[in-house]
From Swiss-Prot:
This is Pro-glucagon. Belongs to the glucagon family. GO terms for molecular function: glucagon receptor binding; hormone activity. SMART domains: GLUCA. Residues 84-89, 131-145 form a propeptide. Residues 25-59 are annotated as: Disordered. It comes from Mesocricetus auratus. Proglucagon is post-translationally processed in a tissue-specific manner in pancreatic A cells and intestinal L cells. In pancreatic A cells, the major bioactive hormone is glucagon cleaved by PCSK2/PC2. In the intestinal L cells PCSK1/PC1 liberates GLP-1, GLP-2, glicentin and oxyntomodulin. GLP-1 is further N-terminally truncated by post-translational processing in the intestinal L cells resulting in GLP-1(7-37) GLP-1-(7-36)amide. The C-terminal amidation is neither important for the metabolism of GLP-1 nor for its effects on the endocrine pancreas. PROSITE patterns: GLUCAGON. The gene is GCG. Keywords: Amidation, Cleavage on pair of basic residues, Hormone, Phosphoprotein, Secreted, Signal. GO terms for cellular component: extracellular space. It is found in: Secreted. It holds the Pfam family Hormone_2.
């Protein structure tokens, strides 16, 4: 991207140089022809003023462009340093924005992972029936919110938790038979 801007800058400098060169050629040609008595003589100060004005306009526009480019580069640098300040290898979905514009919470992801590990360990050990208090789970599901304050789709969340609970209860209560 920077290479494109550098090439564009060189192109602008070349175009400006060709304009100046063509202006000088025009001035030399007009001076080589004798002026008639009826034509007013051009004031050399006026020509220099026009040339300085066009150069100043170009310089002003180019300076504004460079200032805006420096500001964009600075903002990009700030964003990159914020993302990489800890130099931690991140999964692709961490710190990315959801469709609603909310950020994934590292703490909740960690806690959910720990709960899943504990649940799998509990299933592997094959302990007895685990009771799930329905009222507490439903209240927790209704109270969950995204970071931006919008409610998640509560009905789907509740139905998913009920289906999961029924499936786990079915797994626990089903006797395992070995077919030989």
């Amino acid at each position: 991207m920077k290479n494109i801007y550098i090439v564009a800058g060189f192109f602008v400098v070349l175009v400006q140089g060709s304009w100046q060169h063509s202006l000088q050629d025009t001035e030399e040609k007009s001076r080589s022809f004798p002026a008639s008595q009826t034509d007013p003589l051009e004031d050399p100060d006026q020509i220099n003023e026009d040339k300085r004005h066009s150069q100043g306009t170009f310089t002003s526009d180019y300076s504004k462009y460079l200032d805006s480019r420096r500001a964009q580069d600075f903002v990009q640098w700030l964003m990159n340093t914020k993302r990489n300040r800890n130099n931690i290898a991140k999964r692709h979905d961490e710190f990315e924005r959801h469709a609603e514009g909310t950020f994934t919470s590292d703490v909740s992801s960690y806690l959910e992972g720990q709960a899943a590990k504990e649940f799998i360990a509990w299933l592997v050990k094959g302990r007895g029936r685990r009771d799930f208090p329905e009222e507490v789970t439903i209240v927790e599901e209704l109270g969950r919110r995204h970071a931006d304050g919008s409610f998640s789709d509560e009905m789907n969340t509740i139905l998913d938790s009920l289906a999961t609970r029924d499936f786990i209860n079915w797994l626990i209560q089903t006797k395992i038979t070995d077919k030989k």
